[in-house]
Amino acid sequence: MSKAAITPLLKFEIVEIIKANVFPTYANTYLCIGRPTRWGDDADPELATEIEDVVYSTNYINQTFRDMIAMKRVAAADTALVVPRVDWVTGTRYDEYRDGLELFSHTDKLTLGGTVNASANLITTNTAVFTGSISVGNTITLNAESRQVVGVNATHIVVNTNFTYAVLDGTVVRTDNTYPHFANTFYVRNSKDQVFKCLHNGADNGVGLQSTIEPTIDIDGQLPENPWISTSDGYKWKYLYTIPYGLKQKFFTRTWMPVVDDNAVVAGSTSGRIDIVEIHDGGTGYFLDNGESGNVSSLSIITIEGDGVGAVATARIASGVITEVNILNGGSGYTYAEVVVNDPDQLPTGNLANLVASISPPGGHGFNPRKELGCYSVMTSVDFVGTETDTIPVGTDVVPFDFRQIVLLRDPMLANGIFANGSVYRTTTKLSLTDPGTSNYTNDETVYIGTSEEDSTFTATVVNWDPNTNELFVNNIRGEPTIGSTLTGGVSAATSTVLGVEDPTVALFTGDLLYIENRDKIVRDADQTEQIRLVLSF
C-alpha cells in the first residue's frame, strides 16, 4: 500500500512546457474556426440548439478537419500564463499564507455545528442546523462516507445513496469544489491592477478578520522598504506585480488574469526569510527589568532558532502578555524555525508564550509569482479582424455567416509538402460558378453534382456565397468537383456551372489537433473583430 500525490509544481511545469513548445517559437500552432452548420438535427430546431459533445475518435477528428473554415497562426504575444482572478472586496476575510497550509486545494470543507443521526439515506438533526448551510446538489461527508444531497429542510437531509452504517451523534461536513479558484483565497488584485499576497489576515486566532482597507502601493521606481505593507485593518500584504495594460487588454477576463514577474520584487526576495511570527499564546508574567511593559529586545527574551541565519525580532508586552512580534530582520535560509522566549524576569507564576514563525517559499515571497499563486493554466487570445485580407468569410444582414467550433492545430502542412508558417489560411475550397440567375445559394446548405443529393458524385457544405463574384466557398467535401458540371443547391435549388476549382493552400488532415471546443454560434460581419480566448488548464 502506498499514498502519492502529484504536486502543483508538476502542473506548473506542464503549462510552462506547453507555452514553450506548443506555441512559438518551437512550433507553428494555428487557431482554427469551423462548423458553419447547426448542431443536432437541422430538421428539429430544439435538437439543433444542443451543443455537440467532443469525441476523440478517428471519425470525429476527420470530420473536424472537414468542417474547418480558416486558421490563424498563434503568435508568441498571443499566449500568457494566467491564474484565477480574485478582486479585493471590502468585508472579505482573506486566507493568510502559512508555511504549513495547503494553498492550492480546490476542496473547501465546512463543518456544520452540532451533531446528527443517520439511518439509510436520511440524516436527522440532533443539534445541527441545516437551513442555509446545505443545498440540493451539495456533497457532504458523514462518518467518512461522501454522498450527494437530493433533499433538505431545517430538520433533515436526504442523500442519493444509503449510508453503510447507522450513525449516532455524527458530524456533517459540506465539501465544495471551488475550481478554478482555490479554496484558500490568499491573493487579491486591487483597483490599480496590483496583485498582493496575504501574509497576515489581522488576527492570530486562526480565523482572521475582515479586510476593510484595500492594499495599494505607489510605484515611482522603488518598492516599499519593508518586504510587505501593513494596512490599518491589521492585514499585512506582500506586493507581487502589476498587470501590464497590454496583457490586461488581451488576457484579462471575468475568471482569469495574467501573472508576470516584477523584476524589482524578484531582486528583493530572500529564500527562507521569516516575515511573520504569529502569537498563538502570548503567555503571562513577562516584564522589563524595571517592571514596566513596553518593547523588549529579542536579544534578551526572543531567539529564532533554526537552520537559517540572521532572523531578529522584538516583542511588545502589555500587562505581562506578548501582544506583538516585530521582525527587525527576517534572515535567510530557513527551512525550519523555532521561536524561543526566555525572560529571566518572568514571574514564577507566568505561562510560556507560544510563538510560531512562518517561513517564505523557496526563493522568497515574490520570487516566482507563477508558482506562488499556483499557476496551472495558459491562455491563448487571438484576434480575427474582419476578413483578414479576404481570407476569412464574413456575413451580411441578408446572408449571415457563423461558426461553432474552435480548434488548436499544431504544425499543419501545405499542399506543397512543407510546414505551414503563414499568418492566415483559408481551409475551404473556392468554386467559381456561372451566374445562378435570380436564385442564390444559402449558407450552410448542401450543394451537389448529380441528379440528386443521394445520387451524386460530389457534395459539400456552403460556407459562404459571394453573389458579386459568383464565388462559392465550401467545406465538408465528399468527392471531386469537375469543371463544366452543374452544381445544385439542396435547399435553394440554385443551379450553376462550375467554371473553376481552387483548393485550399493548406493540406487538410495534416497536423496535430490539440484542442477542440464546440460553442454556440458566433456570427461574423465585415466590421467585426472576434477576440477568441482559450484556456488550457492542468
Where are these regions (language model features)?
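Residues that act as N-cap/strand-start positions at coil-to-secondary-structure junctions
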Residues: 134, 143, 180-183, 309, ...
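Extracellular interaction modules
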Residues: 154, 161-171, 334-335, 351-352
